[in-house]
């Protein structure tokens, strides 16, 4: 069973300082997660590229099946602010 904090840490360590990562276990089973990530690294990148950047540090968990499902919401800081968030 995976811990949301471990997932958050892996994603956060792969992105520039100042990135914001939130991870929630959506089923309580430790294998289905949802992440919301805000990072300058996403500026100028399409959604597919952004998601690839987030999935990269999780590849080993996806390959072994430890991480079964991971829903992503990724934003540049500007996109995040346009949604009314700070």
Question: Which role does the model predict for each range below?
Answer:
Residues 7-11, 48-65:
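Short, non-transmembrane amphipathic alpha-helical segments
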Residues 24, 32, 51, 68-70:
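Histidine-centered active-site/metal-ligand motif
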Residues 2, 30, 45:
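Residues that form or flank phosphate/diphosphate-binding pockets in enzymes
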Residues 1-20:
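N-proximal, solvent-exposed amphipathic alpha-helical segments enriched in charged/polar residues
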């Amino acid at each position: 069973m995976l811990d949301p904090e471990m997932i958050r840490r892996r994603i956060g360590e792969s992105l520039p300082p100042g990135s914001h990562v939130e991870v929630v276990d959506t089923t309580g089973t430790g294998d289905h997660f949802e992440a919301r990530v805000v990072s300058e690294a996403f500026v100028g990148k399409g959604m597919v590229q952004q998601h690839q950047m987030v999935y990269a540090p999780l590849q080993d968990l996806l390959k072994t099946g430890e991480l079964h499902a991971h829903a992503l919401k990724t934003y540049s800081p500007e996109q995040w602010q346009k949604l009314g968030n700070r």
